[in-house]
Amino acid sequence: MIYTITLNPAIDYFITLNETLLVDEVNRGSHEIYKAGGKGLNVSKILSVLNIPSKAIAVLGGFTGQYIEDSFAKDPNIEMIPIPVDGMNRINMKANYGKKALCINGSGPVVNDCTVQFLLDEIAKINADDIVVISGSMMHGFADDFVTALAQAVHQKNAKVVIDMEQITMEQLKECKPYLI
């Protein structure tokens, strides 16, 4: 089984503005799209398109977390495993106007020890030869070495780790001993 882990999921809100962005003015949009995502969840989406099942572990909270979870509910190839967090998942806004874009990413909630433990409990359920993809950014509150600890927990189960993250150092990446980066 392939597991994907998304430590900082988001709702991406795309809007096309009718005119140039005006500061201190009301700007009107003509087209809006909401997409549930996060890098690990996007990996699960691609796997699903290829008809490959996956289990998507995602840290979710608030109405935004519920929206993200609901967005994957009807996909038969993705089993969503929500990890509860206090607060709301972030909303990232992308406003396109002309040939320019304004991108604003929310920060999201801060994880606590309970969230970390729920996540480690899910990792304890994986089997040998499973593949665990850790992808994207981390919410505030995760320890700097959390991904290393997560990778070590995966290795203890004789499973493979794939890492696609910007927030870890090369030294941490080496400690994770990834199967693929």
PLM feature segments, named:
Residues 1-23:
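Positively charged, low-complexity intrinsically disordered leader regions
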Residues 1-3, 102, 130-131, 180:
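Structural motif
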Residues 2, 54-56, 161:
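Hydrophobic/aromatic residues located in beta-strands of well-ordered beta-sheets
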Residues 4-7, 58-59, 84, 94-96, ...:
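Short beta-strand segments
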Residues 7-12, 85-90, 167:
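Short glycine-enriched loops at secondary-structure junctions
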Residues 28-88:
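Substrate-binding N-lobe of the ribokinase-like
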Residues 94-128:
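Conserved phosphate-binding/catalytic loop of the ribokinase/pfkB sugar-kinase fold
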Residues 131-181:
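Conserved beta-alpha-beta core of the PfkB/ribokinase-like small-molecule kinase fold
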